[in-house]
From Swiss-Prot:
The keyword Transcription applies. The modification N-acetylalanine is found at residue 2. Its main location: nucleus. The keyword Protease does not apply. InterPro entries: Mediator_Med11 (IPR019404). It comes from Homo sapiens. This is Mediator of RNA polymerase II transcription subunit 11. It holds the Pfam family Med11.
Length: 117
């Protein structure tokens, strides 16, 4: 049950980030609209620029926290979608078996030659 709670909390955090990105875009739009006017309201521009900067920093921090969490969760478990390591181990084992067969056949040949003499 705690796992679902943690997952729901993570999803809520991502939804908050999404809303914050919407606010960032809205702030940017307001600034662009204000800049397109002949006479701009400096205080409005300053407030919107400060809100934009604060929102971007908040989104960056939250996304970094989400990425750190996902990295911590993922590093403790093998990547299930990749079989490269297993295939490579199998290929190396087959090469060792072939090499052992080659050496055993050399030993057998040497033994047969010694018995013939």
């Amino acid at each position: 049950m705690a796992t679902y709670s943690l997952a729901n909390e993570r999803l809520r955090a991502l939804e908050d980030i999404e809303r914050e990105i919407g606010a960032i875009l809205q702030n940017a739009g307001t600034v662009i609209l204000e800049l397109s006017k002949e006479k701009t309201n400096e205080r409005l521009l300053d407030r919107q620029a400060a809100a934009f900067t604060a929102s971007v920093q908040h989104v960056e921090a939250e996304l970094s926290a989400q990425i750190r969490y996902l990295t911590q969760v993922a590093t403790g478990q093998p990547h299930e979608g990749s079989s490269y390591s297993s295939r490579k181990d199998c290929q190396m084992a087959l090469k060792r078996v072939d090499y052992a067969r080659l050496k055993l056949s050399d030993v057998a040949r040497t033994c047969e030659q010694m018995l013939e003499n």
